[in-house]
């Protein structure tokens, strides 16, 4: 678990340090645009204005809390077999997985916003057409991998790269919202 507050589920970045377990895993992500996130929040009675600097953070929190509720609490993550996920079905059972403290079969369309759920469904089906063995009910979808990049971007001057109001403060890499991983963070640092 990678949650940072009570009542949320985050499954990002967990693998045993020796990388010697029998399971493979990967994170699949969907781009979240501000207008779509604002619409989603309005439907859920959260009325932050579209230009609010913490709008995407509020969106992230809503999804993580939905995962916690559907997962049954105690950091048990909601999950579905891949073909069941793409067919909007609740899996009758789940295979073993590396995520501890465990998984709970759940309707992920109730956890993920519709546009995220639909985009993932289409992506998984497309992968299945290109990679033999990818699209199978032996694979599982676990919710939610919601911390791939910062939902907040700290402003910086385009030329000098420092904060526009604080001299000698140089926002960069993942935490400042300018990268989404180790390689892109290193590239931003080089800049």
Range-by-range predicted roles:
Residues 1-107:
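An anion/pyrophosphate-binding glycine-rich loop and adjacent beta-alpha core
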Residues 34-36, 175-178:
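A generic structural motif
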Residues 184-191:
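An active-site-proximal "capping" alpha-helix that borders the catalytic cofactor pocket
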Residues 40-42, 181-184:
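Short acidic, glycine/serine/threonine-rich loops at helix termini
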Residues 58, 178-180:
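Glycine-rich loops and low-complexity Gly/Arg-rich segments
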Residues 106-173, 179, 186:
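A glycine-rich dinucleotide-binding beta-alpha-beta segment and adjacent secondary-structure elements
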């Amino acid at each position: 678990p990678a949650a940072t507050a009570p009542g949320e589920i985050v499954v990002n970045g967990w693998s045993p340090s020796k990388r010697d377990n029998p399971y493979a895993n990967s994170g699949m992500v969907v781009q979240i645009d501000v207008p779509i996130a604002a619409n989603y929040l309005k439907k859920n009675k959260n009325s932050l204005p579209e230009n609010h600097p913490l709008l995407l953070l509020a969106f992230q929190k809503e999804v993580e809390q939905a995962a916690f509720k559907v997962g049954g609490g105690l950091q048990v993550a909601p999950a579905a077999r891949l073909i069941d996920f793409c067919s909007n079905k609740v899996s009758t059972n789940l295979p073993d997985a590396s995520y501890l403290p465990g998984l709970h079969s759940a309707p992920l369309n109730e956890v993920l916003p519709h546009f995220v759920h639909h985009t993932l469904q289409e992506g998984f089906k497309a992968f299945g057409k290109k990679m033999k063995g990818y699209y199978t009910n032996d694979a599982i979808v676990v919710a939610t991998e919601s911390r791939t990049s910062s939902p907040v971007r700290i402003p910086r001057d385009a030329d000098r790269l420092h904060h526009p109001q604080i001299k000698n403060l140089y926002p960069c890499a993942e935490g400042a919202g300018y990268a989404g991983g180790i390689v892109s963070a290193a590239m931003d640092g080089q800049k």
